[in-house]
Swiss-Prot record:
It comes from Taenia solium (Pork tapeworm). Transmembrane segments: none annotated. The keyword Cell membrane does not apply. This is Triosephosphate isomerase. It is found in: Cytoplasm. The active site is at residues 94, 167. Pfam families: TIM. Pathway: Carbohydrate biosynthesis; gluconeogenesis; Carbohydrate degradation; glycolysis; D-glyceraldehyde 3-phosphate from glycerone phosphate: step 1/1. GO terms for molecular function: triose-phosphate isomerase activity.
Amino acid sequence: MTRKLFVGGNWKMNGSYSHINTFFDTLQKADTDPNADIVIGVPACYLKYAQDKAPKGIKIAAENCYKVGSGAFTGEISTEMIKDCGCEWVILGHSERRHIFGESNELIGEKVKHALDSGLNVIPCIGELLSEREAGKTNDVCFAQMDAIAKNVPSKEAWDKVVIAYEPVWAIGTGKTATPAQAQEVHKVVRDWIRKHVDAGIADKVRILYGGSVTASNAKDLGTQPDVDGFLVGGASLKPDFITIINARR
């Protein structure tokens, strides 16, 4: 089954008003694949500005949200605030949230449920550390993360609002990249897990992105893999290289 290409950007704690202006002006003028879904995650303080500046067809995502709608949670952002900025997407469970800020599978699952219940589309992230890969635990780690996500998707219909991102933690910001074959291997076992534990039809439809040091030079080879449906791009999503990645299937 051919699934529509999805290219996600994740600016992390980067960007500025001037960068948004320059970047989106470049993107506006570029010849990009009209058949690709493009969603760019930006810091919370720039959500509204980026949403207003984004070229037509490009969606803006928050990089995180909390599991409840409001309250005494200093520094957090709610789903309603994200929607108030005009945004429809949120990235959840990124490896930096898991390993720097200590977010558990349980908490990420709760965030997924709340975001979906609030009407947002979600990009939940999964992936293993280098030590876990070397210990042969890649599948176990990813399956545990998927279980926490899947049991918090409230209905089969809600899966239409879910795009999974596989990010091998050992390949993020390190310059190391999983080979196309390594990426395909994990994407396939994750899809097979969804087929077994959720639904065969959902497994065929849900898009699974690769998110480990994607660059203009490796995107095309990664994108040829049958179970790699796009990318979640970090550093390269801040640069003109992002245009080449968007055009990976051309």
